Amino acid sequence: MDIQPITTYTGKVVPLFNDNIDTDQIIPKVHLKRITKSGFGPFAFDEWRYLPDGTNNPDFNPNKPEFSGATILITGDNFGCGSSREHAAWALKDYGFNIIIAGSFSDIFFMNCTKNGMLPITLGENERKYLASQKEITIDLPNQTVSANDKSFNFQIDETWKHKLVNGLDDIAITLEYEDLIEQYENKNKG
């Protein structure tokens, strides 16, 4: 799963206003048998997404025709709580989400999103409700704004995560940015 740079991003939204959506609800443990990051998308929100007979649940917002192709998930508070499985971020990315806007995130889940090229954004309830009522919204990561029509909202993000996402860098690429310093240190401290 390559990490694509995120600078300005416009996408279709889907609301899923549940609080405390945990990683087992995002990707049930029964589907954690893969050894790669891909292939988890069909199992994202498995217990909500499908009816007992395996057909799509028509009441689950992401299954509704008006939300088809949504790449921005707008959700409640404490998103990604529960176990620290990175599979939850993999499943959401593989499903097609690039941006998740919530009232709050589990710290580990937030980090797993950024490690996998997804931008997690924290906004208040009124802002999320307004954005969820729009068909498309635009995120400007360098300026840290989310906008739709005539309204714009600021969000906070650590400069390290921002740098990573704007430049499409994974952990190895970040380390390689310091290759000269690492080499200097190793040469200086040869035993």
UniProtKB/Swiss-Prot annotation:
One of its GO terms (cellular component) is 3-isopropylmalate dehydratase complex. Catalyzes the isomerization between 2-isopropylmalate and 3-isopropylmalate, via the formation of 2-isopropylmaleate. Belongs to the LeuD family. LeuD type 1 subfamily. It catalyses: (2R,3S)-3-isopropylmalate = (2S)-2-isopropylmalate. GO terms for molecular function: 3-isopropylmalate dehydratase activity. GO terms for biological process: L-leucine biosynthetic process. Heterodimer of LeuC and LeuD. The keyword Glycoprotein does not apply. NCBIfam families: leuD (TIGR00171), PRK01641.1 (NF002458). This is 3-isopropylmalate dehydratase small subunit. Keywords: Amino-acid biosynthesis, Branched-chain amino acid biosynthesis, Leucine biosynthesis, Lyase. Its EC number is 4.2.1.33. InterPro entries: 3-IsopropMal_deHydase_ssu (IPR004431), Aconitase/3IPM_dehydase_swvl (IPR015928), AconitaseA/IPMdHydase_ssu_swvl (IPR000573), IPMI_Swivel (IPR033940), LeuD (IPR050075). Pathway: Amino-acid biosynthesis; L-leucine biosynthesis; L-leucine from 3-methyl-2-oxobutanoate: step 2/4. The keyword DNA repair does not apply. It comes from the Bacteria.
